[in-house]
Curated annotation (Swiss-Prot):
Residues 427-438 form the EGF-like domain. The lineage of its organism: Eukaryota, Metazoa, Chordata, Craniata, Vertebrata. PROSITE patterns: EGF_1, EGF_2. One of its GO terms (biological process) is carbohydrate metabolic process. The active site is at E135. It holds the Pfam family Glyco_hydro_56. SUPFAM superfamilies: (Trans)glycosidases. This is Hyaluronidase. The keyword GTP-binding does not apply. Disulfide bonds join C47-C340, C211-C227, C365-C376, C370-C427, C429-C438.
Length: 449
C-alpha cells in the first residue's frame, strides 16, 4: 500500500510540475555541460587583424569562429550567392538563375552546392551551426506577398507560356502547384545534401519558423505579440521542412521603436513560443534545438540594446528553453577603429556581463536540478521567471592584466534561491535521460538516437 501511495504521489507531482503536458526530451547540447550557448556571427575580423582591437568574446563565454570571422567551425551562414544556384531577384532587381525555382535545374544546383559546401566547410567533422539564409522567396505560395508577389506573377507567366491553351483559372492553379513543388525540392534537397556531407552540423534555414507578429507599429498598446492563427497553421504545413532540419533559427531582432517596451517582450516571447512549438512537433524522439538570431544593437542602427532589452532577448531565449542565441551583425561593427572600440566597450560592459550571468545561471540550474542531464525551462512559458544569477548570492568579477582578461563568478545558491528555481523551472531531459530531475538513464531512449 505504501508503494502504491508513493507512485501516486510521484505521478501527481509530475503532472502538477509539468502542468499535465508531456515535455519532449532535448538533443544533448553542442558542448558538454553547456545548456545555453551564445554565438557571435558578425564579420568583425578586421577589428582584430587590422585595428588590433580584441573584442574579448571568449572572455565572456561567447562561441565564435577563428579571428571572429563571419563563417567558420562554430557557425557558417550561407547567403544566396554562397550556395548552389539559388533562383531569385535581389534587392536591386537583378535576376539570378531563372528567378523562380521551377525555372532552374535542381541537379545543377545540388552539384554546385556540393562544391560550395566542400569549399566553405572543408572540415568533414564540422560540428557547428549551418545556417542557410534564403529570404528572397518563401516555399508557400500564400506567403509570397508584398515585394515577393513577383514570384507568383513570374510563376503564372511561366505556366502561361508553357500551356497557352489553358484557362486563366487553371493556369493560376498550375502555377501555384508547380512553384510549391519546385520550392520544396530546392529547400529540402539542399538541406539533406548539407546534412549528408556534414552530418554532425546543426542545419536549418534562417528565419524558420517565422511568426509574422510585426504589427507592433500599428497596434500600439493593443499589440499582443501573438502569432496570427493563419501563420501558425501555415507553419504546421511546413512539417516536411521541420522533419528534415536538425536545428531551428528564428530571429528576435528588435527595432528601435520597441526599445525598453512591453511590446518588445511580447514580440520576442511569442516568436520563441512558436519556435519551441515547432521544435516539439518536428520529430518523435526529441525536440529540435532552437538557436534564436538576435542583434546586440537595435536593427538598422548602431545603438546598443538597453539592459532591459538584453533581458528581453538573451534572458527570454534562455528561460524558454532554447539551446542558444546567435548574435548577428553587419560590416559596420568593424568598419573603423572607433566602431570596434564601441563594440568592445559594450562587450566589456552590459552585454558581456549579462551573457556571463545567463550562461552561468543556466549551467548552475542544470547541474543542481537536472544533474547535468537536462536544461532548465520555465514551468509556465508565459511567466516572467528568468535564469539569472541571484545578486545577493553571486558576484561577477572581471580580472585583466597585460596578457589576459578573465571573468570569475563567485557565490553559491542559498535556500531561497533553490526554492525560486524549483517553483519556476523544470527539467527538459537530454536524450537518454528521464525523470523529474533527469536522474534515470534509459537505454531504450539511447537506442532511438
Amino acid at each position: 500500500m505504501y508503494h502504491i501511495w508513493i507512485k501516486f504521489l510521484a505521478a501527481w507531482i509530475f503532472l502538477k510540475r509539468f502542468n499535465g503536458v508531456h515535455v519532449m526530451q532535448a538533443k544533448a547540447p553542442m558542448y558538454r555541460n553547456e545548456p545555453f550557448l551564445v554565438f557571435w556571427n558578425a564579420p568583425t575580423t578586421q577589428c582584430r587583424l587590422r585595428y588590433k582591437v580584441d573584442l574579448d568574446l571568449k572572455t565572456f563565454h561567447i562561441v565564435s569562429n577563428a579571428n571572429d570571422s563571419l563563417s567558420g567551425s562554430a557557425v557558417t551562414i550561407f547567403y544566396p550567392n554562397h550556395l548552389g544556384v539559388y533562383p531569385h531577384i535581389d534587392d536591386r532587381g537583378h535576376f539570378f538563375h531563372g528567378i523562380i525555382p521551377q525555372n532552374e535545374s535542381l541537379t545543377k544546383h545540388l552539384n554546385k552546392s556540393k562544391s560550395d559546401i566542400n569549399r566553405i566547410i572543408p572540415l568533414k567533422a564540422f560540428h557547428g551551426l549551418g545556417v542557410i539564409d534564403w529570404e528572397n522567396w518563401r516555399p508557400q505560395w500564400d506567403r509570397n506577398w508584398g515585394s515577393k508577389n513577383v514570384y507568383r506573377n513570374r510563376s503564372i507567366q511561366f505556366a502561361r507560356d508553357l500551356h497557352p491553351e489553358l484557362s486563366e483559372d487553371k493556369i493560376r492553379r498550375l502555377a501555384k502547384k508547380e512553384y510549391e513543388k519546385a520550392a520544396k525540392s530546392f529547400m529540402r534537397d539542399t538541406l539533406l545534401l548539407a546534412e549528408e556531407m556534414r552530418p554532425d552540423g546543426y542545419w536549418g534555414y534562417y528565419l524558420y519558423p517565422d511568426c509574422q507578429n510585426y504589427d507592433y507599429k500599428t497596434k500600439g498598446d493593443q499589440y499582443t505579440g501573438k502569432c496570427p492563427e493563419i501563420e501558425m497553421s501555415r507553419n504546421d504545413q511546413l512539417l516536411w521542412l521541420w522533419r528534415d532540419s536538425t536545428a531551428l533559427f528564428p530571429n528576435v531582432y528588435l527595432e528601435i521603436i520597441l526599445r525598453s517596451s512591453d511590446n518588445a517582450l511580447k514580440f520576442v516571447h511569442h516568436r520563441l513560443k512558436e519556435a519551441m512549438r515547432i521544435a516539439s512537433m518536428a520529430r518523435e524522439d526529441y525536440a529540435l534545438p532552437v538557436f534564436a538570431y538576435a542583434r546586440p544593437f537595435y536593427a538598422y542602427t548602431f545603438e546598443p540594446l538597453t539592459q532591459e532589452d538584453l533581458v528581453t532577448t538573451v534572458g527570454e531565449t534562455a528561460a524558454m528553453g532554447a539551446a542558444g542565441i546567435v548574435f548577428w551583425g553587419s560590416m559596420q561593427y568593424a568598419s573603423t577603429v572607433d566602431s570596434c572600440q564601441k563594440v568592445k566597450k559594450y562587450m566589456n560592459g552590459p552585454l558581456g556581463r549579462y551573457i556571463v550571468n545567463v550562461t552561468t545561471a543556466a549551467k548552475i540550474c542544470s547541474r543542481v536540478f537536472c544533474r547535468k542531464n537536462g536544461r532548465c525551462v520555465r514551468k509556465h512559458s508565459d511567466s516572467n521567471a528568468f535564469l539569472h544569477l541571484f545578486p545577493e548570492s553571486f558576484r561577477i568579477m572581471v580580472y585583466a592584466n597585460a596578457t589576459e582578461k578573465k571573468v570569475i563568478v563567485k557565490g553559491k545558491l542559498e535556500l531561497e534561491n533553490l526554492i525560486y528555481l524549483r517553483e519556476n523551472f523544470m527539467c527538459q531531459c537530454y536524450q537518454g535521460w528521464k525523470g523529474l530531475y533527469c536522474e534515470e538513464y534509459s537505454i531504450k531512449d539511447i537506442r532511438k538516437i
